[in-house]
Amino acid sequence: IKITYICIIMSKVNEEYLIKSLDNENNSGIENLSTRKIKAIKNDYLQQLQLSREELKDYHKKLKEYRTVDDLTNIQYGRYIRWINLKNPENICLTTGGVIIDIQLQDDGIYVLCKNFRNKRMKIKIDECFIFQKLTDQEKTILAALDYLEK
């Protein structure tokens, strides 16, 4: 009886959290996705880099809780991102990343200004990078529900 009661309470908490997550407008970009779709899109991006099998596995592991963002509508202030700079195809590497503190529209393109844990600021041009944004707990909750419904 005790275990059943705990499961009912946890189920109610998860239900309330899911409703709260769905009401959050910042999560609107995730509603048409699923974990499988996110992995497929991420894989398509990484395959374009023509990485070795081991490097590809390593990148997938490092980007497990991230999704690709390729337009301005999905990039959100205060979110943690990592990116791969495409300017030098001979030196492809995944950055440790930073938190988005500003988005700047300039004559030559759109730039994202980030700050890392050492307060170092970095400016990246959206058109020259593959950008991966870390999933929030709310987004993970929505994805879990969408994955369940997809079965």
Language-model features, listed with the residues they occupy:
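Short, solvent-exposed secondary-structure boundary/capping segments
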Residues: 106-116
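Short coil-to-beta transition motif at edge beta-strands of beta-rich domains
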Residues: 72-90
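Intrinsically disordered, low-complexity, charged/polar segments
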Residues: 12-18, 22-27, 117-151
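Short, Lys/Arg-enriched N-terminal segments with co-localized hydrophobic residues
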Residues: 1-9
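Short beta-strand-centered aromatic/proline hotspots
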Residues: 90-107
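Mixed-charge, Lys/Arg-rich low-complexity intrinsically disordered regions
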Residues: 41-76
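Extended boundary segments
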Residues: 10-48
